[in-house]
Amino acid sequence: MKHQEYILQKAVCRFLEKEYPNVLFLSDTIGNIKLTESQAYRNKQIQKNGFKCPDLLILEPNRLWNGLFIELKIKSPYKKNGQLYKNEHLQAQEKSINDLIKKGYFAFFKWDFEDIKKLIHAYMKDK
């Protein structure tokens, strides 16, 4: 599962480099690697407790938002009725996304590469 998410993450990053070479972005790698017990402990000590940082941070403001943060998934985290699946990790990620939105960042879950590209293009056009 994580490997497929990494492939999507890498594709989005290559897309950003090609289409928007002057835009700064940061891609979280911690979720895609296995940390030793001591590394996991040290990493936890320097993270904001309870905050689940999205996988991709695009550090480019537009007219409406301070930046674009995307939590990448390989499939939709939503049920057919639009509700988030009941999962503690997903719920924590959704809370972090909502907190980011309140602070002026455009943040969301996304799982389809073509949809992600369209949304990034739309965001970048709105300058």
Outline where the language-model segments fall:
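Catalytic phosphate/metal-binding cores of nucleic-acid and nucleotide-processing enzymes, i.e., regions
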Residues: 1-127
